[in-house]
Amino acid sequence: MGGWSALAKLLGKVQAYSPAGGKVWLSVLFIFRILLLGTAVESAWGDEQSAFRCNTQQPGCENVCYDKSFPISHVRFWVLQIIFVSVPTLLYLAHVFYVMRKEEKLNKKEEELKVAQTDGANVDMHLKQIEIKKFKYGIEEHGKVKMRGGLLRTYIISILFKSVFEVAFLLIQWYIYGFSLSAVYTCKREPCPHQVDCFLSRPTEKTIFIIFMLVVSLVSLALNIIELFYVFFKGVKDRVKGQSDPYHATTGPLSPSKDCGSPEYAYFNGCSSPTAPLSPMSPPGYKLVTGDRNNSSCRNYNKQASEQNWANYSAEQNRMGQAGSTISNSHAQPFDFPDDNQNSKKLAAGHELQPLAIVDQRPSSRASSRASSRPRPDDLEI
């Protein structure tokens, strides 16, 4: 049982990295094969050669008849079967250990690169390559190993080989022994002088164990087939799911389009707010405060808003009847767009704007014409 415990320990490690079907298969292997073979079956076949008797006194006849009837013992045959069907699983375990070793190396290298990154080194490309390698090996966060890529192929190959070995050993057992034991075996072989009859001990008990091991082999084969289909359809499902939404998995959701002409966009995205027009009651020397227009995305917006504000101000002056008034130099506001090389315009302080006059369509009376010819003290010189 010492050898069985070592094999069971190795297979127990595989169970931590196997899907549901693989865990069920390992449970069947442990309980109904290894445990049963190590306890009941060995005791049932313990006296198989010593209890094999033939009705002859010829020396060596019993040995050659036993060798003809049982080329290999059932117990040793089942031991070979368990070893062969476990080897692909152990190869998968070796691949898992290889991936875990790679994970340790990649994590160590990633920590070194992050330390270098804190010192100011540009290691973004190397970190991205490490992430790609982790995805290739199927390594996820918290040390979890996901079955994909080479690991998935190794697991599928192990299932195929286990199924092939199960079928092969069932066929070999059927060819050598059949699936039942007889109580009497007829033997005619040298050095037996004639045809002799040989008798087997406990044939019914041994037949029951043979049928039981046959059923366990069929169950294991069925579990392998189910697991193979499950892994295949799961891989197809994951691939279809990855192809159906590839953009959101890489770049994330799209951001809404931004209207640079809206005041909300100008405020929340770093654009300067449109310049308010001068009020008619603005004191002399009052200057408008403009924001920073280095943001190229809002330059056109600020320019159009400023022109519109001055047009609105002109209309307001005309409506209020302030004809002939001019805007003093102190009211002039420079508008500078330093980043616009082609369409840059600047209203320098000291440049007079054209007077905004209201056109009166009514005919002037004679009194008003005479009154208008007299100078008044509050008239402004132009």
From Swiss-Prot:
Start and end residues of each stretch annotated as Interaction with UBQLN4: 264-382
Region (Disordered): 317-382
Residue list for modification Phosphothreonine: 275, 326
Subcellular location: Cell membrane; Cell junction, Gap junction; Endoplasmic reticulum
Membrane topology designation: Multi-pass membrane protein
Residue location of crosslink Glycyl lysine isopeptide (Lys-Gly) (interchain with G-Cter in SUMO): 144, 237
Top-level taxon: Eukaryota
Biased composition annotated in UniProt, kind: Polar residues: 317-332
GO CC terms: apical plasma membrane; cell junction; connexin complex; endoplasmic reticulum; intercalated disc; mitochondrion; plasma membrane
Listed Pfam families: Connexin, Connexin43
Post-translational events: Phosphorylation at Ser-325, Ser-328 and Ser-330 by CK1 modulates gap junction assembly. Phosphorylated at Ser-368 by PRKCG; phosphorylation induces disassembly of gap junction plaques and inhibition of gap junction activity. Phosphorylation at Ser-368 by PRKCD triggers its internalization into small vesicles leading to proteasome-mediated degradation. Sumoylated with SUMO1, SUMO2 and SUMO3, which may regulate the level of functional Cx43 gap junctions at the plasma membrane. May be desumoylated by SENP1 or SENP2.
Membrane side Extracellular: residue ranges: 45-76, 177-207
Gene Ontology BP term (one): bone remodeling
InterPro entries hit by this protein: Alpha_helix_dom_sf (IPR035091), Connexin (IPR000500), Connexin43 (IPR002261), Connexin43_C (IPR013124), Connexin_C (IPR034634), Connexin_CCC (IPR019570), Connexin_CS (IPR017990), Connexin_N (IPR013092)
The keyword Iron-sulfur is annotated on this UniProt entry: no
Transmembrane segments: 24-44, 77-97, 156-176, 208-228
Biased composition range(s): Low complexity: 362-374
Segments in the Cytoplasmic topological domain: 2-23, 98-155, 229-382
Modified residues (Phosphotyrosine): 247
Entry-annotated residues carrying Phosphoserine: 5, 255, 257, 262, 306, 314, 325, 328, 330, 344, 365, 368-369, 373
UniProtKB keywords: Acetylation, Cell junction, Cell membrane, Disulfide bond, Endoplasmic reticulum, Gap junction, Isopeptide bond, Membrane, Phosphoprotein, S-nitrosylation, Transmembrane, Transmembrane helix, Ubl conjugation
Stretches the record annotates as Interaction with NOV: 244-382
Function in brief: Gap junction protein that acts as a regulator of bladder capacity. A gap junction consists of a cluster of closely packed pairs of transmembrane channels, the connexons, through which materials of low MW diffuse from one cell to a neighboring cell. May play a critical role in the physiology of hearing by participating in the recycling of potassium to the cochlear endolymph. Negative regulator of bladder functional capacity: acts by enhancing intercellular electrical and chemical transmission, thus sensitizing bladder muscles to cholinergic neural stimuli and causing them to contract.
Family that this chain belongs to: Belongs to the connexin family. Alpha-type (group II) subfamily.
Known partners and oligomeric status: A connexon is composed of a hexamer of connexins. Interacts with SGSM3. Interacts with RIC1/CIP150. Interacts with CNST and CSNK1D. Interacts (via C-terminus) with TJP1. Interacts (via C-terminus) with SRC (via SH3 domain). Interacts (not ubiquitinated) with UBQLN4 (via UBA domain). Interacts with NOV. Interacts with TMEM65. Interacts with ANK3/ANKG and PKP2.
UniProt name for this protein: Gap junction alpha-1 protein
